[in-house]
From Swiss-Prot:
Residues 291-365 are cytoplasmic. This is Phosphatidylcholine:ceramide cholinephosphotransferase 2. The chain crosses the membrane at residues 80-100, 128-148, 159-179, 219-239, 248-268, 273-290. Highest expression is detected in cortical bone, followed by vertebrae, kidney and liver. Expression levels are very low in spleen, muscle, heart, brown fat and thymus. Expressed in macrophages. Coiled coil: none annotated. It comes from Mus musculus. A lipid is attached at residues 331-332, 343, 348 (S-palmitoyl cysteine). Its main location: membrane. Sphingomyelin synthase that primarily contributes to sphingomyelin synthesis and homeostasis at the plasma membrane. Catalyzes the reversible transfer of phosphocholine moiety in sphingomyelin biosynthesis: in the forward reaction transfers phosphocholine head group of phosphatidylcholine (PC) on to ceramide (CER) to form ceramide phosphocholine (sphingomyelin, SM) and diacylglycerol (DAG) as by-product, and in the reverse reaction transfers phosphocholine from SM to DAG to form PC and CER. The direction of the reaction appears to depend on the levels of CER and DAG in the plasma membrane. Its EC number is 2.7.8.27. It is a multi-pass membrane protein.
Length: 365
């Protein structure tokens, strides 16, 4: 009787095992069946995965969804276009300064216009040098910060586009209205009276010296409406603050002090009228805020009857640069150059749990 009961028990267990085997589909069979049915491309598992699945059948294959579309594509070629746009307008500005310089009336015939700030504050000679030094420090800080940004290509083309557009506006304003020099201390270079070769030399001198007075390259007059120094001081601070962590308040404060002191020194040096500085600050901040509001809000990227910002002349250019950027850019940093390079990195050192089990099984057998 014991033998008969044991045989019945073994038969019962064998039938249960067969039933469970018939209802269970191994990962390898699932993949092959999927390929046969045409639901996907035929796939085969690696030896490690196959052996690991046989040894440990509780591991089942989970089909992972395809990688979602990158929300922040780098698109460096667009950044290159924005850089060319900014460079063109900067060169155009030097050409326009050279042209306008020939139209500036002599200070003996057209004295400086009345300015309330000049009435209350006397001129300080060294103040303009402080302004230019502050500007160079801010530019240096911004370039360094930009190099460590993870999405530097997107931020870079925003900076180049805004900077180029501001200098395009500056070309227009200084050409249509030529103001007399703000002070009798100005020593303007002599007029060339149609000497094209000498004008080209002046343009190259302005470009090589960055248009700065401390480099001795800015000896021309007429570029008063509006202040290019104020544009640089304001725009670099706005980008530094926007693309740095919010808890870096001390960093923001130092940059704000550099920017504010530089703008005040422009007026203290009597190098620009007060209206030049006010207009430069207003246009720079508004263009920066409008652009980033449109870039961060999906609804503002679409031209519609209710989106009045889409009626700006530069909206098609904005849409070209920002149409693939989904949402606000996170404040992330990364090394400018990865080390070690990708050619020295071995992907064979990375294993999944199942692959590791499969290799252990091979060694044991």
């Amino acid at each position: 009787m014991d033998i008969i009961e044991t045989a019945k028990l073994e038969g019962h267990l064998e039938s249960q095992t067969n039933d469970s085997t018939n209802t269970y589909t191994s990962p390898t069979e699932a993949v092959e069946e999927e390929g046969k049915n045409g639901k996907g491309k035929p796939k085969t598992l690696s030896n490690g995965l196959r052996k690991g699945a046989k040894k440990y059948p509780d591991y089942i294959q989970i089909s992972m969804p395809n990688d979602s579309k990158n929300k922040f594509p780098l698109e460096w070629w667009k950044t290159g276009i924005a850089f060319v746009y900014a460079l063109f307008n900067l060169i155009l500005t030097t050409v326009m300064i050279t042209v306008v310089h020939e139209r500036v009336p002599p200070k003996e015939l057209s004295p400086p216009l009345p300015d309330k700030f000049f009435d209350y504050f006397d001129r300080v000679k060294w103040a303009f040098s402080v302004s230019e030094i502050n500007g160079m420090v801010l530019v240096g800080l911004w370039i360094t910060q930009w190099l460590f940004l993870r999405y530097k290509s997107i931020v870079g083309r925003r900076f180049f586009f805004i900077m180029g557009t501001l200098y395009l506006y500056r070309c227009i304003t200084m050409y249509v209205t030529t103001l007399p020099v703000p002070g009798m201390h100005f020593q303007c270079a002599p007029k060339l009276n149609g000497d094209s070769q000498a004008k080209i030399q002046r343009i190259l001198r302005l470009i090589s010296g960055g248009g700065l007075s401390i480099t001795g390259s800015h000896i021309l007059c007429g570029d008063f409406l509006f202040s290019g120094h104020t544009v640089v001081l304001t725009l670099t601070y706005l980008f530094i603050k926007e693309y740095s962590p919010r808890h870096f308040w001390w960093y923001h404060l130092v940059c704000w002090l550099l920017s504010a002191a530089g703008i005040i020194c422009i007026l203290v040096a009597h190098e620009h009228y007060t209206v030049d500085v006010i207009i430069a600050y207003y246009i720079t901040t508004r263009l920066f805020w409008w652009y980033h509001s449109m870039a961060n809000e999906k609804n503002l990227k679409v031209s519609s009857q209710t989106n009045f910002l889409s009626r700006a002349w530069w909206f098609p250019i904005f849409y070209f640069f920002e149409k693939n950027v989904q949402g606000s850019i996170p404040c992330c940093f990364s090394w400018p150059l990865s080390w070690p390079p990708g050619c020295f990195k071995s992907s064979c050192r990375k294993y999944s749990r199942v692959q590791k089990i499969g290799e252990d099984n091979e060694k044991s057998t």
